[in-house]
Amino acid sequence: MINREIRPDRKNKNIISMIQSCLVLILVVFIIFMMIQITRLQGTARVINYAGLVRGATQRLVKLEITGSRNDELIKYLDDILSGLRYQDGHYDLVKLHDKEYQDKLQIQSEYWEKLKIEIEAVRSGGYQNTDIVNMSETYFHMADETVFAAENYSEKIAVEIRTIELLSALDMLCLVILIIIQTLTAMK
C-alpha cells in the first residue's frame, strides 16, 4: 500500500521536473531572442537622427545655393551620410536597417538626391529662377520625412517584439515559481 502511494507522488515529481526543465529551456530561448532583437535595435536611434539630419541639411543647402553661396562640403557631407545609411560605411557608425520599407524609401530618396544635385549644378550655372530647385527641394523633404518615419516604424516594431518577449519571459518565470512552490509544499507533506 505504501509503495502505491509513493509511486504517484514520484510520478508527479517527475512530471513537475520535466515541466520545469521545459520552462527553463523556453526561458533560455526567450533570452536569446531578446538579445537578437536588442542587437537589431542598437544603432537605430542614430540612423533616425542622421536620416533627419539629411532632411534638414538638404534644405539648408538649397537655401544657400539659391542665395549664391556654394557649399560643396555640405554636399559631400550629405553624400557620406546617405552612403552610410545605405551601406553601413563611412565614419558615422551608422547601422544598416534590415527593413524593406525603410530600404525602399532610402533608395528612392538617394536616387532623387542625385537628381537634386544635378539641379543644384543648374542653379550654379544659370540661377535658381531658371530651375525647379524649390519644388524639387520640397519633394525631397517629403521623401526624407518618409524615410525617417520608416526608420521610426522599424524601431517601434522591434521595441514591441522585445516587450512581447519580456512579457512571455515573465509569464514563464511565474510558471517556474508556481512549480517550485508546488514542489516545496509537496515535499513538506
Regions found by a protein language model. Name each.
Residues 1-10:
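Short, Lys/Arg-rich, polar N-terminal cytosolic tail immediately upstream
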Residues 10-38, 171-180:
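Extreme N-terminal signal-anchor transmembrane helix of membrane signaling/transducer proteins, especially
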Residues 37-76:
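Juxtamembrane membrane-water interface segments immediately C-terminal to a transmembrane helix
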Residues 44-47, 71, 99, 106, ...:
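Amphipathic alpha-helical coiled-coil segments with heptad-repeat character
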Residues 48, 53, 57-64, 104-163:
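Extracytoplasmic
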Residues 64-122:
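Extracytoplasmic ligand-binding sensor domains of the Cache superfamily
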Residues 153-189:
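Selective recognition of signaling/oligomerization transmembrane alpha-helices
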